[in-house]
Amino acid sequence: MNTTLFHPYSFLLLGIPGLESMHLWVGFPFFAVFLTAVLGNITILFVIQTDSSLHHPMFYFLAILSSIDPGLSTSTIPKMLGTFWFTLREISFEGCLTQMFFIHLCTGMESAVLVAMAYDCYVAICDPLCYTLVLTNKVVSVMALAIFLRPLVFVIPFVLFILRLPFCGHQIIPHTYGEHMGIARLSCASIRVNIIYGLCAISILVFDIIAIVISYVQILCAVFLLSSHDARLKAFSTCGSHVCVMLTFYMPAFFSFMTHRFGRNIPHFIHILLANFYVVIPPALNSVIYGVRTKQIRAQVLKMFFNK
């Protein structure tokens, strides 16, 4: 079979169908979000690296999150801006698969690190005397390796399942980026395997959410048992940033899934915007949330920029 029919030379990304006339203006907030994500997370990484007092598990996990976020932003927004501002809609088949790979990899890693951060909060509040015994450097290193390897194992089949599909000349993707099911739906063959595997991958995110909820139920029980009002406030402050980041990541994903599954009468551009929020907004807000709410990070950033 002709390889250009089996696998097209390139795909065309339409951007946000229905808002083509506004692409120029839509690009500006996306550009601002991109700058915030990259500069904010680089700042957090720099602060954690240079301040030895922050070299403990909570900030190690934050450093991992701040390493993932620029990757997720870079996987999506530069190509979006090319589509919005310069009508550079074409993306090679290999480039589209590469983009899909990194979007799903970074998304999986972000979910995994949020579980690790929930566990860190759980140990810090429910068993503080054993914190340094439980979360040793070795344990944190193993968790960091798992954060990378688990999504890698689950994402590689996405690429393989796309490579097995013929496309018969279909190459228009009504989206701003290439993701697994968006590419698979262009195929002229059965995508049943892709759908089943996609649901299995989503179940991993559901498992992560359940693990986080269980952790926070136990954390809340422990907090309400504290006799001191100040101790309760300190406990809430310890995990407040993580809760905000968790909601920022999972809520857009939840609404995107629900509108895709049940919102058949919702305009298509709403689906695309929600899918963009899911991968674009969290990387920017994470750095802002931790920069504002975490006292140690905020103090170091202020010192770095305003102390003479």
From Swiss-Prot:
Extracellular topological domain ranges are 1-24, 75-98, 160-195, 257-271
Keywords assigned:
Cell membrane, Disulfide bond, G-protein coupled receptor, Glycoprotein, Membrane, Olfaction, Receptor, Sensory transduction, Transducer, Transmembrane, Transmembrane helix
This protein's membrane topology, according to the annotation, is:
Multi-pass membrane protein
**GO CC, any one term:** plasma membrane
Q: Name the domain of life this protein comes from.
A: Eukaryota
Instruction: From the record, give the transmembrane residue ranges.
Output: 25-45, 54-74, 99-119, 139-159, 196-215, 236-256, 272-292
* Disulfide bonding pattern of the chain: 96-188
Subcellular location(s): the record lists: Cell membrane
Enumerate the GO terms in the molecular function aspect.
G protein-coupled receptor activity; olfactory receptor activity
Recorded hits in InterPro entries, A to Z, give: GPCR_Rhodpsn, GPCR_Rhodpsn_7TM, Olfact_rcpt, OR51/52/56-like
Q: Which stretches are Cytoplasmic in the membrane topology?
A: 46-53, 120-138, 216-235, 293-308
Enumerate the CDD domains for this protein. 7tmA_OR52E-like
Keyword Flavoprotein among UniProt keywords: no
* Family of the protein in this entry: Belongs to the G-protein coupled receptor 1 family.
**The protein's role, per its UniProt record:** Odorant receptor.
- Protein name in the entry: Olfactory receptor 52E1
Please name the taxonomic classification of the source. Eukaryota, Metazoa, Chordata, Craniata, Vertebrata
